[in-house]
Amino acid sequence: MSTKRPTMELGTVLVVGGCGFLGWHIVDQLLNFPSETDPSAALPKPQGDAKFDYPKLGDRYPRCIAKVAVVDLRTTHNRLPGAEYHDGDITSAESMLAVFRAVKPDIVIHTATPNVLEGNKPLLRKVNVDGTRTLVEVAGGARGDWGGKCKAFVYTSSSSVVHDTQSDLINVNEEWPLIRGALQQEYYSETKADAEEIVLKYNRASPSSMVTCALRPAGIYGEKDTTFTFKVLEHSAKASPTVLRMQLGENNNLFDFTYVGNIAYAHTLAAYRLLFTHSRYESGQGAPLDHERVDGEAFNVTNDSPVYFWDMTRAAWALTGKVVEPEQVWELPESVLGPIGGVAETVLGLLGKTPRLTRRTVRYSCMTRYYSCDKAKFRLGYRPVVPVDEGLARAVGYVVEQERLAGEKKAL
């Protein structure tokens, strides 16, 4: 049986937001994992601990042949050898035209966004909606000539675009409607939905006949994660053993957690499939059949293996030596904690503070929230490569080693 990895030829790829969490991992994959071959780019992980020993990623994902460029607002951090870097503002057509004239990309992968917890509504709309519109129009040639023609545009949307942040979601597919307006309580999700719609409507509508698609990651985590993994470990570091035994809800709620490397892989697959589709259109062949179409489509991306929310949380704690056995758990009902969270928000809000316990955190800890990724499997050929438990070990190991190194530096 052959062990040769498949190869994807992608031409010149511009990763927008390539110095961010997901963007960095996409660049790493496009460059065939310099993080595993170049000591200057290595991801920190604890040494001599079997819990944090895992096989190399470069032997498991397809090999990419690509020239890689990155544009970000600032590119001084999270750089990888082998990519070229450009500072740029996606809300400025002039700024983007200068980058496109220098790079001349065949493919754009657009991951740039403010943090999901960002409460600045004008910033979210300016970057996620106006910035995406500017970027897709520049890529498609509608904002001026930059000396080339972009063939494919992959947008990183969010699984939250179909969620009202309150309802349970059970094996949800891409046919569910986008949630906006009064029903959408998360403004971030509303702006991502608006941006996704802009990108998909632009499919084959530009002067360059550029094809587009959108990916909707669910529950992203992994090395360099500053949301789920970091916050879960921050809580366990500060909480007493008694507090760690407290569980919001019954832990009967399945939840999607998706390793960042698998999400990056879905982006490279989408880019590859779009290139093939663009060539098909350009050569005068018929349009793809509806059940195989990639362009103009949105795709859920998951690990295809939802887990119980608190099992994932306690597994992260256990990797740092803080083990909570099932018989030690104290279940706290959502019906009681939700109102308490509301009171805490009101009281501390008057003081300009945000409580740890909010109605949002209570609901998220107790809701069922997982998606079907069958469409990505059938049309993109996507399969999660790294399982949930390995992804968690990678994510936790990164945080643990980063904190150890920071402690050593502080002690000097």
Predicted regions, residues:
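NAD(P)-dependent short-chain dehydrogenase/reductase
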Residues: 204-275, 316
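Conserved C-terminal active-site "lid" loop/helix of NAD(P)H-dependent oxidoreductases
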Residues: 260, 267, 285-288, 298, ...
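Amphipathic terminal alpha-helices
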Residues: 2-4, 371-379, 383-412
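N-terminal Rossmann NAD(P)H-binding glycine-rich loop of SDR-like oxidoreductase domains
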Residues: 6-40, 44, 48-63
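Mid/C-terminal beta-alpha module of Rossmann-like enzyme folds, strongest
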Residues: 273-356, 406-412
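Active-site Tyr-X1-5-Lys
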Residues: 183-213
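Conserved Rossmann-fold NAD(P)-dependent oxidoreductase catalytic core, especially the SDR/UDP-sugar
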Residues: 134-188, 213
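NAD(P)H-binding glycine-rich loop region in Rossmannoid oxidoreductase-like domains
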Residues: 77-79, 87-130, 134
